[in-house]
């Protein structure tokens, strides 16, 4: 029989990484964008997807539906491994405003070669954005097409919980917001 003094944690309340989204926005189509796609492919081992501009911005020289960015979604153990590399570059320090109210967080790095990818002069150096979506067991009911459910208010992830999870799991430091 279990100890009465020791309270067990509910396994359904435990936080985990649902997905890690990596994004490189070049701001133009062409050779630089294909080189950025190579960087993401080297990092994740998956084929990245190109993002199109929503509307024309003449001052930036961007036309509507022009491919301007490349992104990739990683899940599972590979997501945790890549996130660990990214946080190591940031020295496990995030700001309070890096966390959203729904318990997700994101950050960026200046140079992809800090992640351990060998520098290739033909590719160059790119910065990239990391965005982490956290979840709990049972969150998939909100994603179903048939018999879709809603996540109850008590089961949702809040900003404080995500910050506490980051501090405990990665021994991270949360700096005050700007």
Swiss-Prot record:
One Gene Ontology cellular component term attached to this UniProt record is:
cytoplasm
Where is this protein localized, as stated in its record? Nucleus; Cytoplasm
Cited Pfam families: Ribosomal_L5, Ribosomal_L5_C
Entry keyword annotation includes Nucleus: yes
* Gene Ontology annotations of biological process type: protein localization to nucleus; translation
Keywords from UniProt, A to Z, are: Cytoplasm, Nucleus, Ribonucleoprotein, Ribosomal protein, RNA-binding, rRNA-binding
Q: Which InterPro entries match?
A: Ribosomal_uL5, Ribosomal_uL5_C, Ribosomal_uL5_CS, Ribosomal_uL5_dom_sf, Ribosomal_uL5_N
The entry's function note states: Component of the ribosome, a large ribonucleoprotein complex responsible for the synthesis of proteins in the cell. The small ribosomal subunit (SSU) binds messenger RNAs (mRNAs) and translates the encoded message by selecting cognate aminoacyl-transfer RNA (tRNA) molecules. The large subunit (LSU) contains the ribosomal catalytic site termed the peptidyl transferase center (PTC), which catalyzes the formation of peptide bonds, thereby polymerizing the amino acids delivered by tRNAs into a polypeptide chain.
Q: How does it assemble?
A: Component of the large ribosomal subunit.
Q: Which family does it belong to?
A: Belongs to the universal ribosomal protein uL5 family.
Tell me the protein's name: Large ribosomal subunit protein uL5
Write the lineage as a comma-separated list.
Answer: Eukaryota, Metazoa, Chordata, Craniata, Vertebrata
| Gene responsible for this protein | rpl11
